[in-house]
Amino acid sequence: MKIVIQGLLIIGSIVLAYLVYSTILNPIDFKTEQDLRYTACIESLKNIRKAESAYKDVNGKFTGSWDTLAVFVRKGTLPLVKKIGSLTDVQLEAGMTEKDAIEKGLIIRDTIRVAVLDSLFGKTYNVDKMRNIPFTKDEVFFLGTNVITTGSGVKVAVFESRAHNNQILGELKDKFKQEIINLNEKRRLDGKYPGLKVGSLTETNNSAGNWE
């Protein structure tokens, strides 16, 4: 009888330890994993925004095509105004402005072309992975464009790139299924997108990220 009681106590201790872990430590572990993936996704979305902004500067519009954006980043160029010369202390004391110096040929402005990849991302940036959601096997960020007409009748080009929590945290669903469900439900109740996104297809928000 004594052995049976001891066995039950051991089993009870194991069950109690599991319950403590599930109620206290499991959410902490989930938050750590979520933060790790969110940080990587935010960095990716910032790079996407950077690429889209440069594409619009050159082409006058955003693109909803990953292939088009990748080709632009890999092979495209941007205009860069280079200034040759500067005002001397004597010229500044005499009241000469930079505009005056340009008109007199003392300062020259020359426009050159620089590679998008080198100037914005660096040569080691992997363009092919720009569309991929970090920590996933084959999940891809959504990318879309739209033209919104404001209340004053002005047409504004916009873009949006996003990833749902079910994609960002998909590799964790076996261990943290309920935590992911709870996170999505909280976002829904707060009227917010259950994931990370930059830009918007329905409003002009200066290509802001929903984490900012």
Role assignments for model-derived ranges:
Residues 2-23:
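Hydrophobic membrane-insertion alpha-helices, especially the h-region
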Residues 6, 19, 55-56, 62:
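Broad hydrophobic/π-residue packing in well-ordered secondary structure
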Residues 15-17, 38, 125-127:
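A generic short-segment signal for beta-strand/edge and adjacent turn/coil regions
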Residues 19-40:
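Amphipathic alpha-helical segments typified by the pilin-like N-terminal helix
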Residues 38-59:
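N-terminal alpha-helical signal peptides/signal-anchor transmembrane segments
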Residues 57-212:
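Low-complexity, acidic interaction segments enriched in glycine
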